[in-house]
Amino acid sequence: MPFRDAEYSAIAKMPISGLVRIGWLGLEGDAVADRVHHGGWDKAIHLYPQDHYPFWRERKPGHALLDQAGAFGENIASSGLTESEICIGDRFTLGSAVLEVSHGRQPCWKLDHRFGAKDVMATIVKTARCGIYFRVAQEGEADASVDTHMALIDRPQPEWPVARVFRLLIGGGHKGDPAAVRELAAMPLLAEAWRERAAKLAG
């Protein structure tokens, strides 16, 4: 999808069916246009909770993008798994693959552009409805044609839900809890980019 000034984005995702290969860098056939800011080991899979869609429909009534999953560029559309309930380092099975939570998604201007609005990115920052990135801990396959269940198999850091980390590192909360930010800077299970961000915020 072409964006401004000849930039390209692969944010536009469509529902798929059938058996899908899940490799180290994501779903087989998934396009990543901006490899500097998207994709890679820590951003292999993006989940955006379907639980948030009613919130967005209230704010963007009649917007066609919200008629189906994929509006936020997510690879996985889930219900019952939100940023407040999923923690850094959580491991889930998806088909025969194992996914590990690496960090939340830091929103960028492309979401505003996609929705034709100026407030989507700011609303995500304010509400922590950011979505979740996973790294692939074990390659495998999942059948997108059926209601595939993501099963939690490990939770090493229950005190670190994605929403809390997002508010500290992206939402401005670092000013009120510098000790937590220093802890994040040294957290091996947190994505490298967010560890680096935490280190800068900690000074």
Per-segment meaning from a language model:
Residues 114-126:
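Short beta-strand-turn/beta-hairpin segments enriched in glycine/proline and small hydrophobics
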Residues 84, 139-142:
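Residue "hotspots" at secondary-structure boundaries inside conserved domains
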Residues 1-112, 119, 154-203:
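Electropositive, beta-rich accessory/interaction domains or terminal extensions
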Residues 148-154:
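Short hydrophobic beta/alpha edge segments that flank linear recognition/processing sites
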Residues 89, 141-148:
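Loop/turn positions that initiate beta-strands
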Residues 71-81, 124-135:
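Short, structured beta-strand/loop micro-motifs enriched in basic residues and often containing a Trp
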